[in-house]
């Protein structure tokens, strides 16, 4: 493989951002574990949900790079990494083609998912609509005349799609019913995913402000955005604790608290370090902290049933 080919391959990997996929998978795994807890586990539905969620995450990553590059938001002096389009290695036409291919793959996996999982016409149509909204949300975060990521609505979108829809959707497609208690672990997943976005926006606050990208961090300001970050992390722990207290009722259900010292340490670091450059290593650490919390929660669910 030539150096130029390696450069292009690396550029595409940077745009695809495979390291973000575990966070997309985590919410589906949580929803599936909850379905298993209630005796509704369907491995084929779970697999198709994981594939669809992963493809939606890739679509969001590609669209984010495309939108920011077209708008000129990602400049050489930004703290975060420059990706394929910003480097000039990937053209607009190539990225558009990649977006179209990814949307087609999402449609195929999504159709397979609802065909296998949905037993009524209402469910089939309802999840087709939710799937369409997910595609639109993934693209319009940075793409379009008024992308919602530029007006501070990215956080609520992450909470909805990476929390509520992913967890409760994957549960419903296997259980075909909803229970009110699901809102707690679903919110916890959403808050942890939102914390990852918040770190990204804290890192890029100066370049975003200069380029008119009014993320929630820009709107809140550096101090309040750091307080908000601590609330996201601690809020996720509170939600999981309430779920165990009122629904799971198991000592194993507290296993997620093993991640609490790590989340507290991360919150304290973010509160203390005011330099945006200091947020660069925190992005990967926040992803790992969120993933660890979710996986410990899932393990607690499994152990609570085996120990019963």
Curated annotation (Swiss-Prot):
<dbReference type="GO" id="GO:0009234">
    <property type="term" value="P:menaquinone biosynthetic process"/>
</dbReference>
<feature type="transmembrane region" description="Helical">
    <location>
        <begin position="98"/>
        <end position="118"/>
    </location>
</feature>
<feature type="transmembrane region" description="Helical">
    <location>
        <begin position="287"/>
        <end position="307"/>
    </location>
</feature>
<comment type="pathway">
    <text>Quinol/quinone metabolism; menaquinone biosynthesis; menaquinol from 1,4-dihydroxy-2-naphthoate: step 1/2.</text>
</comment>
<feature type="transmembrane region" description="Helical">
    <location>
        <begin position="149"/>
        <end position="169"/>
    </location>
</feature>
<feature type="transmembrane region" description="Helical">
    <location>
        <begin position="177"/>
        <end position="197"/>
    </location>
</feature>
<feature type="transmembrane region" description="Helical">
    <location>
        <begin position="21"/>
        <end position="41"/>
    </location>
</feature>
<dbReference type="GO" id="GO:0000287">
    <property type="term" value="F:magnesium ion binding"/>
</dbReference>
<keyword id="KW-0997">Cell inner membrane</keyword>
<feature type="transmembrane region" description="Helical">
    <location>
        <begin position="228"/>
        <end position="247"/>
    </location>
</feature>
<feature type="topological domain" description="Periplasmic">
    <location>
        <position position="308"/>
    </location>
</feature>
<comment type="similarity">
    <text>Belongs to the MenA family. Type 1 subfamily.</text>
</comment>
<dbReference type="InterPro" id="IPR026046">
    <property type="entry name" value="UBIAD1"/>
</dbReference>
<protein>
    <recommendedName>
        <fullName>1,4-dihydroxy-2-naphthoate octaprenyltransferase</fullName>
        <ecNumber>2.5.1.74</ecNumber>
    </recommendedName>
</protein>
<comment type="function">
    <text>Conversion of 1,4-dihydroxy-2-naphthoate (DHNA) to demethylmenaquinone (DMK). Attaches octaprenylpyrophosphate, a membrane-bound 40-carbon side chain to DHNA. The conversion of DHNA to DMK proceeds in three stages: the removal of the carboxyl group of DHNA as CO(2), the attachment of the isoprenoid side chain, and a quinol-to-quinone oxidation, which is thought to be spontaneous.</text>
</comment>
<feature type="transmembrane region" description="Helical">
    <location>
        <begin position="251"/>
        <end position="270"/>
    </location>
</feature>
<dbReference type="GO" id="GO:0016020">
    <property type="term" value="C:membrane"/>
</dbReference>
<feature type="topological domain" description="Periplasmic">
    <location>
        <begin position="248"/>
        <end position="250"/>
    </location>
</feature>
<keyword id="KW-1003">Cell membrane</keyword>
<feature type="transmembrane region" description="Helical">
    <location>
        <begin position="124"/>
        <end position="144"/>
    </location>
</feature>
<keyword id="KW-0812">Transmembrane</keyword>
<keyword id="KW-1133">Transmembrane helix</keyword>
<dbReference type="Pfam" id="PF01040">
    <property type="entry name" value="UbiA"/>
</dbReference>
<dbReference type="InterPro" id="IPR004657">
    <property type="entry name" value="MenA"/>
</dbReference>
<keyword id="KW-0472">Membrane</keyword>
<feature type="topological domain" description="Periplasmic">
    <location>
        <begin position="170"/>
        <end position="176"/>
    </location>
</feature>
<dbReference type="GO" id="GO:0046428">
    <property type="term" value="F:1,4-dihydroxy-2-naphthoate polyprenyltransferase activity"/>
</dbReference>
<dbReference type="GO" id="GO:0004659">
    <property type="term" value="F:prenyltransferase activity"/>
</dbReference>
<feature type="transmembrane region" description="Helical">
    <location>
        <begin position="43"/>
        <end position="63"/>
    </location>
</feature>
<dbReference type="InterPro" id="IPR044878">
    <property type="entry name" value="UbiA_sf"/>
</dbReference>
<feature type="topological domain" description="Periplasmic">
    <location>
        <position position="42"/>
    </location>
</feature>
<keyword id="KW-0808">Transferase</keyword>
<feature type="topological domain" description="Cytoplasmic">
    <location>
        <begin position="1"/>
        <end position="20"/>
    </location>
</feature>
<feature type="topological domain" description="Cytoplasmic">
    <location>
        <begin position="64"/>
        <end position="97"/>
    </location>
</feature>
<dbReference type="InterPro" id="IPR000537">
    <property type="entry name" value="UbiA_prenyltransferase"/>
</dbReference>
<keyword id="KW-0474">Menaquinone biosynthesis</keyword>
<feature type="topological domain" description="Cytoplasmic">
    <location>
        <begin position="145"/>
        <end position="148"/>
    </location>
</feature>
<dbReference type="GO" id="GO:0042371">
    <property type="term" value="P:vitamin K biosynthetic process"/>
</dbReference>
<feature type="topological domain" description="Cytoplasmic">
    <location>
        <begin position="271"/>
        <end position="286"/>
    </location>
</feature>
<feature type="topological domain" description="Periplasmic">
    <location>
        <begin position="119"/>
        <end position="123"/>
    </location>
</feature>
<dbReference type="GO" id="GO:0005886">
    <property type="term" value="C:plasma membrane"/>
</dbReference>
<feature type="topological domain" description="Cytoplasmic">
    <location>
        <begin position="198"/>
        <end position="227"/>
    </location>
</feature>
């Amino acid at each position: 493989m030539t150096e130029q080919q390696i450069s292009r391959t690396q550029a595409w990997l940077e745009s695809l951002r495979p390291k973000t996929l575990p966070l997309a998978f985590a919410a589906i795994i949580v929803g599936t574990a909850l379905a298993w807890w209630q005796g509704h586990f369907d491995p084929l539905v779970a697999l198709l949900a994981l594939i669809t969620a992963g493809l939606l995450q890739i679509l969001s990553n590609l669209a984010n790079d495309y939108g920011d590059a077209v708008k000129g938001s990602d400049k050489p002096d930004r703290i975060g990494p420059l990706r394929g389009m910003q480097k000039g290695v990937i053209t607009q036409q190539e990225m558009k083609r990649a977006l179209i291919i990814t949307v087609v793959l999402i449609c195929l996996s999504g159709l397979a998912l609802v065909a296998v999982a949905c037993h009524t016409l209402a469910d089939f149509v309802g999840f087709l609509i939710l799937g369409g909204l997910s595609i639109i949300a993934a693209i319009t975060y940075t793409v379009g005349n008024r992308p919602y990521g530029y007006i501070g609505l990215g956080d609520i979108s992450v909470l909805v799609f990476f929390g509520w829809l992913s967890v409760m959707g994957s549960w419903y497609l296997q259980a075909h019913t909803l229970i009110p208690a699901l809102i707690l672990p679903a919110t916890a997943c959403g808050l942890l995913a939102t914390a990852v976005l918040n770190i990204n926006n804290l890192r890029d606050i100066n370049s975003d402000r200069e380029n008119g990208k009014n993320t929630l961090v820009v709107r809140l300001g550096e101090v309040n955005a750091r307080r908000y970050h601590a609330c996201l992390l601690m809020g996720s722990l509170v939600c999981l604790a309430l779920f165990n207290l009122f629904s799971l009722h198991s000592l194993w259900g507290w296993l997620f608290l093993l991640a609490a010292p790590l989340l507290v340490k991360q919150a304290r670091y973010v509160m203390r370090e005011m330099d945006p450059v200091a947020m660069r290593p925190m992005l990967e650490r926040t992803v790992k902290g969120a993933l660890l919390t979710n996986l410990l929660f899932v393990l607690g669910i499994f152990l609570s049933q085996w120990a019963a």
